[in-house]
From Swiss-Prot:
This is Acetylornithine deacetylase. CDD domains: M20_ArgE. Pathway: Amino-acid biosynthesis; L-arginine biosynthesis; L-ornithine from N(2)-acetyl-L-ornithine (linear): step 1/1. Zn(2+) 1 binds at residues 80, 112, 169. It comes from Shigella boydii serotype 18 (strain CDC 3083-94 / BS512). Its cofactor is Zn(2+); Co(2+); glutathione. Binds 2 Zn(2+) or Co(2+) ions per subunit. One of its GO terms (biological process) is L-arginine biosynthetic process. GO terms for molecular function: acetylornithine deacetylase activity; zinc ion binding. Signal peptide: none annotated. NCBIfam families: AcOrn-deacetyl, PRK05111.1. It comes from the Bacteria. Homodimer.
Length: 383
């Protein structure tokens, strides 16, 4: 039972020492099976029922759901098990060895966000789970850093409907109730190659893309004018042109040009709406040059997310922390968990440490995080 659990710092150390990198590049991508096994064993030791769920379409990735208590509702504490890859040349410490120095715990995943599971396990030492009046669930997901496949699949397949959920991403213990989404597309134009000495015998894809970009930039301006959410520091949907490539020689008519772009929609904007706006913007080019322009997703889209500001979860957490909820521009798994129940993003560590060399979590977060976890379990599972 509880006395089987290693000390907090040893749990943390074991999590960091177990690599679980997710990457779109197969050579860097790793299974999270070993980490899931670690977590599953610890939660079983605490008396939880544990289910391990293979995630389809991934390279041997798994979700874990640990549950205890009976009845409907309850609380879900969630987080992802994977980390981003690391740049060996920029780290001054071993990313897989937990190192404590000057009030900081260094290691890959200390803040983002394997460490959150160490906080949950440690807090449960002081919770009598036999007295829960509502269930407590712990969800550990796969591939948040790439496709969010774990959270997507869990949300699509589970019958659970907790009263509320908290995702322990690093927010410096400032509660987050909304964020923008993310859509990334490849705009591809197929021209007709030819010698540059006779332009009429070809179709220059770069010139067509130049025309398309003009329409896309007009869409960017329209998004800024039509949609507003003043709580965001950037209070409108953003559109960015991030990458372009076309042609292969100065004396050849360009046969193909490809542009990568993204849109970060506000909460409430649908993918159908956004895709319609993009297709409408590009319609003049498509109509003039039939069959030459295509639009494809680069990554599965992430919707915007918002927890109602007057929900009990928001009121309880704001009261416990003495802090108002915030909105942020980055993305999390919250849109998918929010389909099950009202969800907040709230956890130890700073988002500024996410994806950084020499990632760390400040030890000043240890005590308040532990106390907060105990308090929310008491509030949502004991009453």
């Amino acid at each position: 039972m509880k006395n089987k659990l290693p000390p907090f710092i040893e749990i943390y150390r074991a999590l960091i020492a177990t690599p679980s990198i997710s990457a779109t590049e197969e050579a860097l991508d790793q299974s999270n099976a070993d980490l899931i096994t670690l977590l599953a064993d610890w939660f079983k030791d605490l008396g939880f029922n544990v289910e391990v769920q293979p995630v389809p379409g991934t390279r041997n990735k798994f979700n874990m759901l640990a549950s205890i208590g009976q009845g409907a509702g309850g609380l879900l504490l969630a987080g992802h098990t994977d980390t981003v890859p690391f740049d060996d040349g920029r780290w001054t410490r071993d990313p897989f060895t937990l190192t404590e120095h000057d009030g900081k715990l260094y290691g890959l995943g200390t803040a983002d966000m394997k460490g959150f599971f160490a906080f949950i396990l440690d807090a449960l030492r002081d919770v009598d789970v036999t007295k829960l009046k509502k269930p407590l669930y712990i969800l550990a997901t796969a591939d948040e850093e790439t496709s969010m496949a774990g959270a997507r699949y869990f949300a699509e397949t589970t019958a659970l409907r907790p009263d509320c959920a908290i995702i322990g991403e690093p927010t410096s213990l400032q509660p987050v109730r909304a964020h923008k989404g993310h859509i990334s597309n490849a705009i591809r134009i197929q021209g007709q190659s030819g010698h540059s000495s006779d332009p009429a015998r070809g179709v220059n894809a770069i010139e067509l893309m130049h025309d398309a970009i003009g329409h896309i930039l007009q869409l960017r301006d329209n998004l800024k004018e039509r949609y507003h959410y003043e709580a965001f520091t950037v209070p409108y949907p953003t559109l960015n042109l991030g990458h372009i490539h076309g042609g292969d020689a100065s004396n050849r008519i360009c046969a193909c040009c490809e542009l990568h772009m993204d849109i970060r929609p506000l909460p409430g904007m649908t993918f159908n709406e956004l895709n319609g706006l993009l297709n409408d913007a590009l319609a003049p080019v498509s109509e003039r040059w039939p069959g030459r322009l295509t639009v494809d997703e680069l990554h599965p889209p992430i919707p915007g997310y918002e927890c109602p500001p007057n929900h009990q979860l928001v009121e309880v957490v704001e009261k416990l922390l003495g802090a108002k909820t915030e909105v942020v521009n980055y993305c999390t798994e919250a849109p998918f968990i929010q389909t099950l129940c009202p969800t907040l993003v709230l956890g130890p560590g700073s988002i500024n440490q996410a994806h950084q060399p020499d990632e760390y979590l400040e030890t000043r977060f240890i005590k308040p995080t532990r106390e907060l976890i105990i308090q929310v379990i008491h509030h949502f599972c004991w009453h």
